[in-house]
From Swiss-Prot:
One of its GO terms (biological process) is tRNA wobble uridine modification. One of its GO terms (molecular function) is flavin adenine dinucleotide binding. HAMAP family: MnmG_GidA. Homodimer. Heterotetramer of two MnmE and two MnmG subunits. SMART domains: GIDA_assoc_3. It comes from Xanthomonas oryzae pv. oryzae (strain KACC10331 / KXO85). This is tRNA uridine 5-carboxymethylaminomethyl modification enzyme MnmG.
Length: 634
């Protein structure tokens, strides 16, 4: 092998959802990238629930897509049941979700990775990082060492190890080292990282037993078909991308189920003290649900197919680490599961994660230059959260190599910005998942406008290819044309258009009204307006029609939110120099100094969001920073 085989611009460790998006983003941004994975066959594997999207999560997927990422396109190629959640609510909280064929999804991701220029995949476990210990400057990463002793060099490394760092699986009182069921953990790498100046703790997640769907009685369950018409996930997608569609099903646990669980709690590693890591609040185990909601006589279970050509189903709602004999009993006590055959046991897995307050907004570690962390190792849970972080880390790893400034969206620009800001400012003591409620500017951060918010920035940074840019530009131009067409038309009580509106829509035009403003009426939308002969048929692109309608219907709310953002931005981006001496700010309490020293915010906006930070402390900081700026100018 030539020396060039071992030298890259960026090395990505891990081929999961964070790792694949990181490697793809790095390569799209122009960096020669190496993706190292334990097993090439599991690149893009869905380790837990075979689903993409959902409340808050779908927003992240759309943002990944707007920046040229792979997740949405793979979901379109693999989605076998599609739903728009919160469809009856406002556009800010509507979310796209698909049940995916896990084999089709993995194949789609692997094909995208294989086709990406400047990206090389190599199968190897990483045992250590090569780190240059600086004397006059900070430590910096120089490469990695694999389990077989190979040394790969790169000035940027992205670590996306998922649950593999010192991973430990629990089933009852049985426990053993693993990265996930059937895969070895990254034990040596975890030990090496604990020797470095990182704050490391343990988290836990879990998964339910898998069931042979042919052994279930669907006659006693409720059918849950997908939406019609079918949505798509990618802005480049179309319904014809989807494979054959199937239904999911809904059933419930029984009081017998709960009795079985209560009688076996002493054998649960969650309640025996065997598991130390904290699990996800919003995806609790069935043991947790039975204990925490003791008054409930049943819990809902979503019976979700794992694929079109496999018999296995995923019983969403019964994640468990109880002993296998208890799992079998509780499964067979569920409505429709009396004859159920378990194909794989449920289990809990503990793993190492890093305090994300040790990261910059770029996801570069503060302790080691050029080293980026993304995904579950930052304390998050979920494919979508991991993939979004991976894209950001991969992009910034490439920009680090090229000597370009790091990029990270603000809270008012993207859910990705909310995610990163929450992590690096507040940290987390439990697996963090995204919800729309976490975003204070969610009316601005809708699924439908993720491309308008981010594709321009993605194009400037090399993430967006010509085909996506052409599609995006054409869409934006079509929105502008249609908006201009309708805003140029006026209906009055006496003119022909006013009479047409009254006849076609049953709407009285009592005064001169701009046609576009008619959409503001609660009973009207773009589609109904197009029934007016002079106005229709309108545009045939549903995305264009949606943008025209939302921009008009919510213009007042959007304007007020933009004003609010402008006020907040007055000091939001005021930078705080690296290594800033908070002890030198007269008037800051010791408590506030300690909080600031611990988080080391990069700008005033981040400092404001530190728990316990007072307006007075922020004012003192601003005065000190302004005084220092004037001193430098003088």
């Amino acid at each position: 092998m030539s020396d060039s085989f071992y030298r890259y611009d960026v090395i990505v460790i891990g081929g999961g959802h964070a790792g694949t998006e990181a490697a793809l983003a790095s390569a799209r941004a122009g960096a020669h990238t190496l993706l190292l994975t334990h097993t090439i066959e599991t690149v893009g594997a869905m380790s837990c629930n075979p689903a993409i999207g959902g409340i808050g999560k779908g927003h992240l997927v759309k943002e990944i897509d707007a920046l040229g990422g792979a997740m949405a396109h793979a979901a379109d190629l693999a989605g076998i049941q599609w739903r728009t959640l919160n469809a009856s609510k406002g556009p800010a909280v509507r979310a796209t979700r698909c049940q995916a064929d896990r084999n089709l999804y993995r194949t789609a991701i692997r094909c995208i990775v294989q086709a990406q220029p400047k990206l090389t995949v190599f199968q190897a476990a990483v045992d250590d990082l090569i780190i240059h210990n600086g004397t006059c400057e900070a430590d910096s990463v120089r490469g990695v060492i694999t389990q077989t002793g190979l040394r790969f060099e790169a000035p940027s490394v992205v670590l996306t190890a998922g649950t593999f760092l010192a991973g430990k699986i629990h089933v009852g009182d049985t426990q053993y080292a693993a990265g996930r069921l059937g895969d070895p953990p990254a034990t040596t790498l975890a030990a090496r990282l604990r020797e470095r100046p990182f704050a490391i703790d343990r988290l836990k997640t879990g998964t339910p037993p898998r069931i042979d769907g042919r052994t279930l009685d669907y006659g006693v369950m409720g059918e849950q078909p997908g939406d019609d018409p079918l949505p798509v996930m990618s802005f480049m997608g179309q319904v014809s991308d989807h494979p054959r569609q199937v239904s999911c099903w809904i059933t419930q646990t029984t009081e017998q189920t709960h009795d079985i669980i209560r009688n076996a709690l002493h054998r649960s590693p969650l309640y025996s003290g065997q598991i130390e890591g904290i699990g996800p609040r919003y995806c609790p185990s069935i043991e947790d649900k039975v204990v925490r909601f003791a008054e409930k006589t049943s819990h809902q279970i979503f019976v979700e197919p794992e694929g079109l050509d496999v018999a296995e189903i995923y019983p969403n709602g019964i994640s468990t680490s109880l002993p296998f004999d208890v799992q079998l009993a509780l499964v067979r006590s569920i409505h429709g599961f009396a004859q159920a055959h378990i194909t794989r046991p449920g289990y809990a897995i503990e793993y190492d994660f890093f305090d994300p307050r040790g990261l910059k907004a770029s996801l570069e570690t503060k302790a080691v230059g050029g080293l980026f962390f993304a995904g579950q190792i930052n304390g998050t849970t979920g494919y979508e959260e991991a993939a979004a972080q991976g894209l950001l880390a991969g992009l910034n790893a490439a920009r680090h190599v090229h000597g370009l400034p790091a990029w990270s969206p603000r809270r008012d620009e993207a859910y990705l910005g909310v995610l990163v800001d929450d992590l690096i400012t507040h940290g987390t003591t439990e697996p963090y998942r995204m919800f729309t409620s976490r975003a204070e500017y969610r009316l601005q951060l809708r699924e439908d406008n993720a491309d308008a918010r981010l594709t321009g920035a993605g194009r400037e940074m090399g993430l967006v290819d010509d085909a996506r840019w052409a599609r995006f530009s054409a869409k934006q131009e079509a929105v502008q044309r249609e908006t201009a067409r309708l805003s140029a038309l006026w209906a009055t009580p006496g003119n022909a258009l006013g009479r047409e509106v009254a006849d076609a829509l049953g709407v009285t035009v009592s005064r001169e009204t701009n046609v576009l403003d008619l959409i503001k009426r609660p009973e009207l939308n773009y589609a109904t307006l197009m029934r007016v002969p002079t106005l229709g048929p309108g545009v045939d692109d549903a995305q264009v029609a949606e943008q025209v309608e939302i921009s008009v219907k919510y213009t007042g709310y959007l304007d007020r939110q933009r004003d609010d953002i402008a006020r907040q931005q007055r000091h939001e981006t005021t930078p705080i120099p690296e290594g800033f001496d908070y002890a030198g700010v007269r008037g800051l309490s010791i408590e506030v100094q300690q909080k600031l020293e611990h988080v080391r915010p990069q700008h005033i906006g981040q400092a404001q969001r530190i728990p316990g930070m007072t307006p007075a402390a922020i004012s003192l900081l601003l005065v000190h920073l302004e005084r220092a700026r004037r001193h430098r100018v003088a």
